[in-house]
């Protein structure tokens, strides 16, 4: 699998081309929230699901393991070092402290900000349809074949339920072939997608995060408003 090249917009077009060419791969996007978990903070997310991570939990260790993954077919999106929204050390810390492989690198915002409209356009017009692992229950006009629901407070109880929930997700995808499987399951996505790829590499696994939230949850992110600066931003690594 070749490395992605160029800015965020160019990366997205390369991802879409790979999907249309029936290539199998995965994308995970550890960003600000995952960074706080890795840095061992206790905090409550302000994302609409409002889960709480407690320091010294197992999720921190599972994330560390996941983002060091050297599977050449797994792209790992991290915050860029040019937009200035994230702490200035985050880009370097992901690469050096947490050992994200640079050959696998893409942008944490690859499906968001100025790429959101293009991502929505692609998902809505994807004729084969896709599976969605999510907490969102609202009906919407997307070709979703089926939803696999998770508890929106799963982070809170991860220490107790991670084995059974991970097994449930793996059982859900194990027999699927040549499918697009989208994950909107917060930090757990970063743990699950590498495991799914190992068990069953014959699919595309995308960490779409909050991309469909305004449709499946009724919650609005700033980048979905064309009048915000977020909706116009296109990241590039320097």
Question: Which residues make up each language-model segment?
Answer:
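Short catalytic-loop micro-motif centered on adjacent basic/acidic residues
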Residues: 180-184
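Electropositive, gly/pro-rich neighborhoods at or near active sites that engage anionic ligands
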Residues: 1-145
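A mid-sequence, solvent-exposed acidic-amphipathic segment
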Residues: 138-179
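Residue-level detector of flexible, active-site-proximal loop/helix-junction positions
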Residues: 83, 157, 212
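C-terminal functional extensions of proteins
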Residues: 188-238
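A short, acidic, amphipathic alpha-helical segment used as a generic capping/interface helix at domain edges
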Residues: 10-12, 60-62, 163-173, 188
